[in-house]
């Protein structure tokens, strides 16, 4: 007797959803590079095409805290970014990991239905988010825009969202390298860093016209100032604009994260099926990769968005003010928390600000480290990388820990993995805090996401393309 499952509701819709057909044969590495490049080009073009019908505004961006992480570009076709895909993926992984959704991922049929359900939910999220964005007045008051323009804006956002979903599916099914989510996120972050370093545009922050790009400003100041020492100091430490110190800090963090990627605890294992077969099972320092900092950033960013919306509507309400008081900084229309809970979990905007308010800094650092460690320990239970899951993999593959009895594998893994996950989560949280305090070109979260994604792409390319992986390993060992 077969029982009904929620996933069975999705099966009749499979033929109606847009789909990328899986390749019939293995795609050569050169073609994967080409398709990855084409996918990236489409993303970049969509990031520059403005939405038709919006009323341009210089007001505060309520989604400011999520833009870089979600590969979102305000006022363009990439307004939603990868938000629908990320949200859908996390929801379904949570449902599957907690066994609230009955699915057997070892079954090809179940796996395909599960992926179809994720895609359907991502499309529904695109429709829902697009509708909310338009009706809440992000592009202008709906009454001023009119019904026709509002519908047109929603259609543009939904169409762009579906294109992003299909581009991600194109890479996931083997036509390209990695996933669209990681590729778009890292590209968006690197694009923002490159712009802050080399932007030729000028801005006026009360000191006259200055070049926005840190490197361009350095050469400009050295060429026009007679006092070269003063020009260097200004280029390295100028306020409210990207500077050379921030650029150098970004490079330092980049190489530090690459170096730390090589840190791992190796468990000696042996095969019970083949005599003399020994090996090592590595547990990396970043056992859960960048997931903890993504979840922490998503949590705080959504809290900031809700707090801002409530404060703009009820600025005098004491409960709302307890959550956060929001003001614009000089020379910017963007709102930042100046009091309330939001202020204490908002990263300091500079090292000077962190030193001037040590209580806020201590609270912020403690919050990030503890939340990242907690999310990391929780995520291993959801994602199938907990000690119980790894012990099952060992049993299925006929592996045991060398020098231990077969029955003690789970106990040994339970002693190591949760500790490694929590420590790794706290470590990546500490790196994020360091980025925020040093003022890197981009938030700590975005820098870490970009670096870990670039490193994972290097590993994929090393595996797929066959070029030597020991270059990075040699760099790690050199330290």
Curated annotation (Swiss-Prot):
GO terms for biological process: misfolded protein transport; post-translational protein targeting to membrane, translocation; retrograde protein transport, ER to cytosol; SRP-dependent cotranslational protein targeting to membrane, translocation. It is a multi-pass membrane protein. GO terms for molecular function: peptide transmembrane transporter activity; protein-transporting ATPase activity; signal sequence binding. Residues 55-76, 141-146, 268-361, 435-440 are lumenal. Its main location: endoplasmic reticulum. The keyword Transmembrane helix applies. It is found in: Endoplasmic reticulum membrane. Pfam families: Plug_translocon, SecY. Residues 1-33, 98-119, 168-246, 383-415, 459-479 are cytoplasmic. Gene3D superfamilies: SecY subunit domain (1.10.3370.10). GO terms for cellular component: fungal-type vacuole; Sec61 translocon complex. The chain crosses the membrane at residues 34-54, 77-97, 120-140, 147-167, 247-267, 362-382, 416-434, 441-458. Keywords: Endoplasmic reticulum, Membrane, Protein transport, Translocation, Transmembrane, Transmembrane helix, Transport. InterPro entries: SecY/SEC61-alpha, SecY_CS, SecY_dom_sf, Translocon_Sec61/SecY_plug_dom. Heterotrimeric complex composed of SEC61-alpha, SEC61-beta and SEC61-gamma. Belongs to the SecY/SEC61-alpha family. Appears to play a crucial role in the insertion of secretory and membrane polypeptides into the ER. It is required for assembly of membrane and secretory proteins and is essential for cell growth. It interacts with other membrane proteins required for protein translocation. Upon binding to SEC62/63 complex, secretory precursor polypeptides may engage SEC61 to begin membrane penetration event. A cycle of assembly and disassembly of SEC62/63 from SEC61 may govern the activity of the translocase. This is Protein transport protein SEC61 subunit alpha. It comes from Wickerhamomyces anomalus (Yeast). The lineage of its organism: Eukaryota, Fungi, Dikarya, Ascomycota, Saccharomycotina.
